[in-house]
Amino acid sequence: MSRSLKKGPYINLKLEKKVLAMNESGKKAVIKTWARASMISPDFVGHTIAVHNGNKFIPVFVTENMVGHKLGEFSPTRTFRGHAGNKKK
């Protein structure tokens, strides 16, 4: 189920506060976050956000196409090692 429209999108307040402070000062630094469920707002465009994937932080450069998606979508948690192949002797 999707989130109720009357509630609005979930955006981590701490993350949003950091991005807005960087927009005012004009700085461009990497912001670390564990908030994978946070929605990407238009204020985040142009920033690099390091999203935790359970093991390490994956840097995600936010573009206009990403607005409306969640941060966790761009930080995969599992590594694909390939399907079992034919064992050649």
Swiss-Prot record:
InterPro entries xrefs: Ribosomal_uS19 (IPR002222), Ribosomal_uS19_bac-type (IPR005732), Ribosomal_uS19_CS (IPR020934), Ribosomal_uS19_SF (IPR023575)
Pfam family, one: Ribosomal_S19
PROSITE patterns named in the record: RIBOSOMAL_S19
Keyword Ribosomal protein: yes
UniProt-recorded Gene Ontology molecular function terms: rRNA binding; structural constituent of ribosome
GO CC annotations on file: cytoplasm; small ribosomal subunit
GO biological process: one example: translation
Keyword set includes Lipid biosynthesis: no
UniProt superkingdom: Bacteria
Keywords (A to Z) from UniProt: Ribonucleoprotein, Ribosomal protein, RNA-binding, rRNA-binding
Function recorded in the entry: Protein S19 forms a complex with S13 that binds strongly to the 16S ribosomal RNA.
Similarity comment: Belongs to the universal ribosomal protein uS19 family.
NCBIfam families cross-referenced by the UniProt entry: rpsS_bact
Protein name, entry field: Small ribosomal subunit protein uS19
Source species of the chain: Porphyromonas gingivalis (strain ATCC BAA-308 / W83)
Taxonomic lineage: Bacteria, Pseudomonadati, Bacteroidota, Bacteroidia, Bacteroidales
